[in-house]
Amino acid sequence: MMSKLGVLLTICLLLFPLSVLPLDGDQPADQPAERMQDISAEQNPWFDPVKRCCNWPRCNVYLCGPCC
């Protein structure tokens, strides 16, 4: 019984190797550095264009930009 399972597993791995599965690192949306480059501070709704900074309650350097 165990040898039959071994043969079946070997055949399955030969027909469908694990290397064809997509890895998580291959997805560009999964890389935080690239996600942060897609959003500029000026497009953020919390960004004050007159002061050119973010309002204090919503201020976060990683999300919006410089704080007021």
From Swiss-Prot:
Keyword field contains Disulfide bond: yes
GO molecular function, one term: ion channel inhibitor activity
Tissue-wise expression: Expressed by the venom duct.
Residues excised as propeptide: 23-52
Cysteines engaged in disulfide bonds, as pairs: C53-C68, C54-C64, C59-C67
InterPro entries: Conotoxin (IPR004214)
Compartments reported by the entry: Secreted
Signal peptide range in chain numbering: 1-22
GO cellular component: extracellular region
Keyword tags: Cleavage on pair of basic residues, Disulfide bond, Secreted, Signal, Toxin
Record remark on domains: The cysteine framework is III (CC-C-C-CC). Classified in the M-2 branch, since 2 residues stand between the fourth and the fifth cysteine residues.
Similarity comment text for this entry: Belongs to the conotoxin M superfamily.
Protein name per the record: Conotoxin reg3.14
Organism: Conus regius
